[in-house]
């Protein structure tokens, strides 16, 4: 049986509590120990996984757009295939970045160049495919693979446990509860979430998330809104 090596490149752990990191970690958990025998068109094969290895693999999956990975691309592509994850586009992070106009445009140009340099792209959002195509990227080399979470970590609990969990967080155990998880950013819909909460005071609304990337402005708007 043939063996190949999959090298996973990521610096998502540089900032804790954000979606790219959790998506990367969940993917690692999903594939770990499950690639020993893969059925291919030309026979079975095995994928050995390495993480942030300096030696490039037959397949190198780049999860974050760090310049150090971009500079390695010629060597990566000379040995194998470069696969890039598309977690965001210029228009989806525009409200989250607080950069001068020139720096902002330079980053956006770099981001699209990064994506264009990949042999294959994987996006977590199917709506990104036509948008990437509008940037001049061949949609045939883009695959949609949604994010996923571990069923053993996120699972249903019985009614008594629900009450206990709510009480432990200072919530009314009996009220209808709405929960949203995400970074505290305008693009995540936190202001709309707050507006709905004000309109439905009979329910309790909980937002689980931090402001790792420029969320302070959003927080200021949220505080202003709640005072009105």
Residues covered by each model-derived region:
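Membrane-proximal helix-turn-helix segments that form the acceptor-binding/catalytic region
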Residues: 102-121
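Active-site proximal beta-strand in glycosyltransferases
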Residues: 58-64, 75-95, 122, 145
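Short donor-sugar binding/catalytic loops of nucleotide-sugar-dependent glycosyltransferases
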Residues: 12-14, 181-185, 211-213
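Short, structured helix-loop element that forms part of the nucleotide-activated donor/catalytic region
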Residues: 204-228
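Carbohydrate-associated surface elements
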Residues: 127, 148
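Conserved donor-binding/catalytic core segment of Leloir-type glycosyltransferases
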Residues: 166, 172-188, 194-200, 206
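N-terminal subdomain of nucleotide-sugar transferases
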Residues: 1-49, 198
